[in-house]
Structure formats: structure tokens, C-alpha cells
Amino acid sequence: SEIRGRLPEDYPSQLGDLFFSLLPAGSITGAPKPRTVQIIREAETYDRGFYTGVTGYFDGRNLDSAVLIRFLEQQPDGTKVFKSGGGITFRSDARNEYEEMKQKVYVPLY
């Protein structure tokens, strides 16, 4: 998505607060966001690290960013962990979601 708007002059000093209020991204959590974030925290037994976070750059005027929906992370011991996910809804079919996940991770892993 491309988002445009008018920002106050002091917006650079507020970028951290802005990102904190926007993350995790709604495309990751679904809705209603507060409840889905709670469910994710209860269900997952690990810290996501950078996965589903945001990366990008800010040149003082322009901000380009992306949500890390597929991410390869090197652990302190040198092992690498590939993280990926998918959106589950009440209409999701477990078998189809599993097959889609295999397709998403196939290229980076093989």
C-alpha cells in the first residue's frame, strides 16, 4: 500500500511512537487487532524477533518500509531459522493452508 498525508513539522521526532501504534501490522494480525494480538501472544511460545516487524529507510523526508512476512534469521550459534506465516480465517481449510505454507517456504529452504 502507498499511504499519503500531511504530517506536522515535528513528525520525525514522533516516528517511534507512530510505528509502535501501527505495529504489528493489521495484515499480520487480522481484526479485531487487540484481541488477535492477545491470541497470538497466548498461542506462541517464542519471540518473533524481526519476523513480521518492519524494515526500511528514512531519508529525513521519505520513508520506504516493508513488513517482513518471510524472513531468514541467523541465530547466535550460527544456525539459520526461516520464518513464514499465513492468514487463517473462519473459512480457511487446514489442508489448503498447509499446502500454501509449503509453497511459500519451498524456494528459500531448497
Predicted regions and their residues:
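Conserved hydrophobic core element of enzyme catalytic domains
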Residues: 2-110
